[in-house]
Amino acid sequence: MKNLKWRRVKKVTMVEFFIAFRHIIERKFQSIFSVLGVAIAVTVFIVSLTVSNGLEKNMINSLLTMSPHILVKNKKSKFFDNYEGTVENVKKIKGIKAVIPQMNSQSILKGNGLAKGVLADGISPENVKNGLNLKIVDGNNNISELNSVLVGEQLATEMNLKVGNEISLVSAENKEIKLIVRGIFKTGFLDYDSNLAIVPLEAMQILSDQGRVATEIGIKVEHPEKVEGILSQVRNVI
């Protein structure tokens, strides 16, 4: 007992206890807020990434509604004269989903006292039904009658067009044909929805006065990731 040394313990006052308690509590809340801050930041990042991916996917789907995976044009001429033979050869390639000969031209659409420059795209009725994944918001996608036309939703709004309306399509050569609006479509891509009019391929051939020709051939494949391999086969048959 003689070797033991005693130290006097200082009495803790209420003020000192309060200061210590406050620092402990503050640090605890600082830690909580730090964790919450990180959690919120990560959540915002994940949500933003998800939205971004969703928007990107929607954009790609909108573009591919009208845009093919492979687009074939004639280097030597503005037109394909014997496009039917080319189409049949391409259809034989494994992995091809649709082959769509098209006849398109910048034209003027007139209706309800209004006129607007549009891209008139001539596509066969069969390819409109089976080759295009058009979302029809009014009417239908049947353009089997020669005087049929489908217009984009924004274009219909701008020109106050309704299903059943009669309109005129005027070519760059100032040739005019009368058409009836059969349907209104929406792709989700503004350039298409506000500037595109789809008419029967034969009607565009008549309007252009070039006979049975096409300006391009669009090709859609079953597996887009394999498009490079299919492209090399397409080159061999055209």
Region spans (language model):
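A residue-level structural signature of the nucleotidyltransferase/glycosyltransferase Rossmann-like core
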Residues: 147-148, 196
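The feature marks short, hydrophobic/small-residue-biased sequence motifs that occur predominantly
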Residues: 102-143, 175, 198-201
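Short, solvent-exposed hinge/capping segments at secondary-structure junctions
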Residues: 132, 151-165, 207
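N-terminal Sec/SRP start-transfer signal
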Residues: 2-43, 56, 61
